[in-house]
Amino acid sequence: MGFHLLTHALLISALMSIGTTPVNPXXXXXXXXXXXXXXXXXQHDCTCVEEGQPCQGQACAAECEYNQCLFDGR
């Protein structure tokens, strides 16, 4: 009987903890996209100079948005 109660207690605490840490999928995707954009900017030697303008650098086909170089593929 003790094992049965312990199993129920663990199940209840697992179910109660499911909603305690919400994950925002948009924030996770933005973080992954920012890391990929930073790696691509370093490969193409791109520099963000002015918001809304093309980034500067050799073979750099990116636009400066949010203080970083964003490529068309994003």
From Swiss-Prot:
Annotated signal peptide: 1-25
Lineage: superkingdom: Eukaryota
Propeptide boundaries: 26-42
Tissue specificity remark: Expressed by the venom duct.
Keyword Calcium annotated: no
Keywords: Disulfide bond, Ion channel impairing toxin, Neurotoxin, Secreted, Signal, Toxin
Any GO MF annotation of the entry: ion channel regulator activity
GO cellular component, one term: extracellular region
Entry PTM: Contains 3 disulfide bonds.
Record localization: Secreted
Described purpose of this protein according to its UniProt entry: Acts as a neurotoxin by inhibiting an ion channel.
Domain notes: The cysteine framework is IX (C-C-C-C-C-C).
Family of the protein in this entry: Belongs to the conopeptide P-like superfamily.
The name this protein goes by in its record: Turripeptide OL08
